[in-house]
Amino acid sequence: MTGPVMRAVGITQFGGPDVLEIVERPVPEPGDGEVRIRVAAATVNPTDTALRSGRFRAPDGVEPPYVPGMELAGTVDAAPAESVFRPGDRVMAITSARTARGGAQAELVVVPADSVVAVPDGISLVAAATLPMNGLTARIALDLLALGPGQTLAVTGAAGAVGGYTIQLAKVAGLRVIADALPKDSELVRILGADVVVPRGQEVAAAIRLATGDGADGLVDAAVIGQEVLPAVRDGGHVIAVRTYRGETERSIKVTTAWVGDYLRARDKLADLARLAAAGWLTLRVARTLPAEFVAQAHALLEAGGVRGRLVLTF
């Protein structure tokens, strides 16, 4: 390898957390309309554990090591003259791990300018890193549902990062929210804004239906329950599957998968999320910070379950 190099999290083979390592990669050069960011913080998400384990196929045409990560925050390192950003600006961004450049978990990352927004004053870079991917996943889910004020939204996996943002964005939109929670998470989910909290578990669909009468108008399945959640939704309602959907449908219920990749360059959407976070409408939850060298521990913690908020790697 010639030229300047940087540190990055690398997946050289598929397997458990122990396959993760810190590797050297060439420093990426920004092209037209791109920004290079010196990463301060990048989150660990289920998409990263899926890539590492081989549950997600390897990126097409990309040789290992694969660099995971889809959301980050840091400072601008280089930007084109016509950009609104200048070196040193505090920013957050969403990116993809499915390119030759790799994902967010590296010292320096190049992304399209349309994937970057400023971090508002008063929000730390560690906290800001938890917003782009998870917040935009919640945003696209609600955009697909297109429910109006007063309608009822159900949320599974409500205590998680996507679920929490979904609740808070739904309340901004004037929706009535019914959300699931384990007993230890019930108070958290209420604080996030749920109007009704039902027990999480095998009977969650029945509990939601009981709370609504004839079922919710729409449901965001952040817990990835699949077909078993359909009884929670009214006839002709709409279910948004986060990441994947298992099963058939029934009673004219529409099922749509929310792909955050559709919002990779939705700068206006991300800027609106940043504005809501600065105003206190969105809660940025950091479960724990770890140096990038402890990425294997972060994966193990995430896969053990029970993480509330996001695990954040620091560089």
Segments the model singles out, each with a brief description of its role:
Residues M1-P4, K269-F315:
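C-terminal hydrophobic helical "lid"/dimerization subdomain
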Residues P26-T43, F56-A97:
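Glycine-rich beta-strand-centered segment in the early N-terminal region that forms part
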Residues G61, I94-A154:
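NAD(P)H dinucleotide-binding glycine-rich loop of Rossmann-like/cofactor-binding domains
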Residues L131-R200:
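Mid-domain Rossmann-like dinucleotide-binding core that forms the NAD(H)/NADP(H) cofactor-binding site
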Residues E203-G213:
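Short amphipathic alpha-helix with an adjacent loop that forms part of the alpha/beta core around
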Residues V224-L282, A292, F315:
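Glycine-rich phosphate-binding loop and adjacent beta-alpha segment
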